[in-house]
Amino acid sequence: MLLPRMLEEVVLAVPARDYDRVVAGLAVEGIFHVDSPPQGVKGEVDRSYRALLTQASERSSRIRQYFDLAGVEPYRVSGVEIEVGGWGESWKRYLEKYSGVEKFYSGLLEEYSEAEARLKELLDIEARIAPVAHLDVDIARLYRSGAFDFAVYYGSYSEGLESRVGEIVSRVGGLAAVEASGGSVVVAVAVPKGALSKISPEILRLNLSIYTPPEGVPGSPREAMEYIRGEKARLGRRLVSIQEMASERLGELAEFYTVVTAFENIFKFLVSTLRRGETRIVRGFVDVRDSGRLRSIVDRMTRGSYVLLSLGVRRGGEAPIPSKVDLPQFLKPFSRVVELYGYPEPNEIVPTVFLAITLPLTFALMFPDAGQGLLVLLFSLFYLRRVSRDWAYVIAVMGGASVVSGLLAGEVFGPLVSKMLGLPELWYRLGLETPPYAMPTYAIDHGEEELVPVLVYRALNVSLFMGAFMLSFGTFLGVVNGVIKRDWVGLVESRLPRFLLFASITGPFLVYMDAGEAGSVLRQALLELGGDSIAAKLVLAGSVLGLAWMLLAGPIIYMLEGHSPLAGLANSFLEAYESLLMLVGNIPSFLRIMALALAHSSLMFVIYYLTVMIMQGGILADVVGALLYVGGNLAVAAMEGLLAFAHASRLHFYEWFSKFYSGTGVPYTPIKVEGVRIKIAGQTF
């Protein structure tokens, strides 16, 4: 769970007559990750399978578009049987079998794309017409006139515009009409043939733009807008109709997708296979737990006529190997977040377990409102779940965490609902002057302004504690990764001294959990050389030792390796400089936790007071105030929820992962056909 699984690298050689059965057996079991052919072994790859793999991959991608058209995630069905007499011939036969389904969805997708393109075109035309939409004149016809030049300009109105336009047009014996409305203006100009090109640059310099009648719509802007509205409505209905039609044959589409992805995986196996006479050779990786199963399957498929060469069991090394990550089911969705940064290497700690705790916690501290957290939770369960189950699970957990932090902050849809539910009184009954995570606006709302500095200070402590923990823990995990990778040089040169430096500086925030106390210790350590404080002296000693270690380790290691120590000194200087920059930049970066929490409570406080002010004018005012409060909650939940997720992810990716996690691994993807039985020569797998 904390480390990728140990994998065994094997080279498998089997007779050509048995190879199809071996491929089918291993694909059904899904335990063998096929890699590039073994180096140094003579043989050739059947290039025809590359073309078939390309076809299957393109088909698979296209089918996923068909699922998107129906508004559902791609899925496979079980119980599908593929009868194989030859992989290439069978592929063509099954394409023919499902050609009707493919033609149906291909036509729908083409029609949908055309309707979408037309809708986008109409929206662009609508935006162009909007400035002159009130004109009920066939402008396009006037533009085509052979007797005179005509043009319409639009823009922002400025004092004296009429006289300046009139002066410009009169010089060529033309006419101009200026219509101002609010801060906007429309100018129509008619001049003798050929004169427009002479005066148009001057008119454009008045901060006006020229209107060009779009093609394909009525020439009158007002009629064009009515036409566009009608077309938009018609196209909208057609798009909905196409999506409904796409849902009618999802069962057949899922079966087709199951077959196509099965062939796609089989072809991935075959393109990595070497042909050498009557022998087929393939190289790959298997989980050490499945080594026995692999040998048993191959032995059964070949009746003992095979050679399996083990190249060793390892977790990483010079040659790249895939990473197999095993996680409990309740943690797997969080791997989607980790994979946004990158996949773990086989010899580094998998951060998913830790992230599943720290990401919801960070999000909740930034977004402390039980009501809006509940909205996030419900949004995940009832909408996002249809788009992605994994992301719905992650967001639901984060929403649930916000429900808890909101209760601790005394916030449920802002102050108004919190008071209606009696949440502030609950904390009073528990013997607390304020809720444990109350924001400064809570004190202002309850007439306890003297508590504002206390609550700001409390939020500051929480932010700095989280930052200190994640930074020190991240550099510690960097040390652990160095040990796992046996990167002894990297450990001595950078990982250990960086951990010592970070632990020394962040330690006071963890020990005292008080920004003032921690700041006092750091001040004595850095400005008074420790003063009379033992803690400050420890901080100073750790910091100086960490920096000195970082600066000296490089030159010494370079010298021991027979290189110039000056090159090592330059590298060490950059390492020390980068570490100091991280310290200076990363710790304050965690103050965004406090900043977003304060911003959220302030927004809700403003909405609350506006609502209270409005709701003092009768029934209608009460309705308006209620709508404002509900709409404000929805807007803040959407905006602040997105911001909190973005900033929580940033703290993990840039401030935390950069200390220990590379994310440059390759996932272990065994060849696997899901929901498929393969029948070869009367034998079913």
UniProtKB/Swiss-Prot annotation:
The UniProt keyword set, sorted, is: Cell membrane, Hydrogen ion transport, Ion transport, Membrane, Transmembrane, Transmembrane helix, Transport
- What Pfam families does this protein's entry cite? V_ATPase_I
The reply to whether Cytoplasm figures as a keyword in the UniProt entry is: no
Q: Which GO terms describe its biological process?
A: vacuolar acidification
Q: How does it sit in the membrane?
A: Multi-pass membrane protein
The regions listed as transmembrane in this protein's record are: 172-192, 348-368, 394-414, 464-484, 538-558, 604-624, 626-646
Q: Which GO terms describe its cellular component?
A: plasma membrane; proton-transporting V-type ATPase, V0 domain; vacuolar proton-transporting V-type ATPase complex
Q: Where in the cell is it found?
A: Cell membrane
**Keyword Ion transport among record annotations:** yes
Give the principal location in a single coarse category: membrane
Q: List the residue ranges forming a coiled coil, or say none.
A: none
For this UniProt entry, the molecular function terms from Gene Ontology, in alphabetical order, are: ATPase binding; proton-transporting ATPase activity, rotational mechanism
Q: Which InterPro entries match?
A: V-ATPase_116kDa_su
Q: What superkingdom does the record give? A: Archaea
> What quaternary structure, including any partners, is listed in this protein's UniProt entry?
Has multiple subunits with at least A(3), B(3), C, D, E, F, H, I and proteolipid K(x).
Name the family the entry cites.
Answer: Belongs to the V-ATPase 116 kDa subunit family.
Q: Which PANTHER family match?
A: V-TYPE PROTON ATPASE SUBUNIT A (PTHR11629:SF63), VACUOLAR PROTON ATPASES (PTHR11629)
Function per UniProt = Component of the A-type ATP synthase that produces ATP from ADP in the presence of a proton gradient across the membrane.
Q: What is this protein called?
A: A-type ATP synthase subunit I
Annotated organism of origin: Aeropyrum pernix (strain ATCC 700893 / DSM 11879 / JCM 9820 / NBRC 100138 / K1)
